[in-house]
Amino acid sequence: MIKLDIKDAKKFLKTNVFSLQDQVNELHDVIQNKSGLGNDFLGWLDLPLTYDKEELDRIYKLKEQHKNVDAIVVIGIGGSYLGAKAGYEFLKTPFKKQKPELIFAGHHLSANYLKHLLKYLNKKNYVINVISKSGTTTEPAVAFRLLKAHIENKYGVKEARKRIFATTDKARGSLYQLAINEGYERFVIEDNVGGRFSVLSAVGLLPFVFVGIDVEKMIKGAQDAYHDAQDPSLKKNKAYLYAVTRFLLNQSGKDVEYLINYEPRLAFFAEWWKQLFGESEGKGGKGLLVHSASFTTDLHSLGQQIQDGNRIIFETVLNVKKTDKLSIPFVEEDLDKLNYIAGKEISYVNEQAFLGTKEAHIDGGVPNIVITIDKMDAYHFGYLVYFFEIACAMSAYLLEVNPFDQPGVEAYKKNMFRLLGKK
């Protein structure tokens, strides 16, 4: 469960949030009946209930077969990478050596990164999970070509085939064909599930299982979020209330939304969130510009601009109620003048920083939406994923755009291919 507080956003709105209830009711029916724009990509809608249990069992068995590996290299970009990365960072213990280690590749074209990754893997016992619906997306295809050669040279072609798992289309595409030809273990990206909505499919579940994340709890969180989203009432449906509030803030002249966190482990969740909303809404000259910031760190860089810059910003704060306990010690000399908070929990100081910042930003004309979760665990990760997915669908439909395509992404690819001389 989560808490949603919009009281520090409502005062900036020109329209009462509840005045959109009839429109929300209509759009809720459009979503549930799968009759709106992009309706052939609504497979994620029921995924918490209809996920492939047999496929998940195969993932568990695969993990058991490779229980002694040092690392799993996940190759993917965009939705084929960000969800797994977000969950891994959300749930891992800082500085704890993870076995197997989760390594990502194919999410950029850095020769420096790939060269040193290959060198690093020379001494690692590893497996590969390549994720791509088509198999021809440039960044992961380049990385896979290099890593496929590396793992075959390291273990031999026959053994390498047992160590490469393909998450791809169920019936077509170059990666599908390669997986068939080579005999790789295959997992499915369904046609009706777009990449940024695929976290709760094999795209995210396979990496999560391999690093020991409790995916059953994650799915339970998503199921609860699903059930909480069945009633369209804005007095009950927090995801829709969030969608309406951000829509009306946009209508009131706020063009930029920052997702704010006070826990570093949430930084990559924000990266997933930015893709979710940026690709879903940013089309036809519409959509909020989505940014993220990690406080208090970014208060010493972006804080000035947020506090005193162009008044086109609002903040959605992702707040965590329970964190680790660690007290500030008393020091006799008190040269740093911190004894006034000696004995206090650092989490308490962090909370006061949050409250003080919120007050300052509101006074400075920056609306605040606050989403509070009890703690950072698999359940709450799953809940938040579905919460934001369904909120995103509602938000995009309020804008009258298709939430599930991304035509603008092709522009850079066409230019790059032309410059590279692709025929």
Swiss-Prot record:
UniProt EC number: 5.3.1.9
Family assignment from sequence similarity: Belongs to the GPI family.
GO MF term list: carbohydrate derivative binding; glucose-6-phosphate isomerase activity; monosaccharide binding
Database matches in InterPro entries: G6P_Isomerase, Phosphoglucose_isomerase_CS, SIS_dom_sf, SIS_PGI_1, SIS_PGI_2
UniProt superkingdom: Bacteria
The protein's name: Glucose-6-phosphate isomerase
Catalytically driven reaction(s): alpha-D-glucose 6-phosphate = beta-D-fructose 6-phosphate
Metabolic or biological pathway, per its Swiss-Prot or TrEMBL entry: Carbohydrate biosynthesis; gluconeogenesis; Carbohydrate degradation; glycolysis; D-glyceraldehyde 3-phosphate and glycerone phosphate from D-glucose: step 2/4
Subcellular location field: Cytoplasm
Residue positions of the active site: E279, H300, K413
Signal peptide span: none
Organism: Acholeplasma laidlawii (strain PG-8A)
Described purpose of this protein according to its UniProt entry: Catalyzes the reversible isomerization of glucose-6-phosphate to fructose-6-phosphate.
Keyword line: Cytoplasm, Gluconeogenesis, Glycolysis, Isomerase
GO CC terms of this entry: cytosol
GO biological process: one example: gluconeogenesis
Main location: cytoplasm
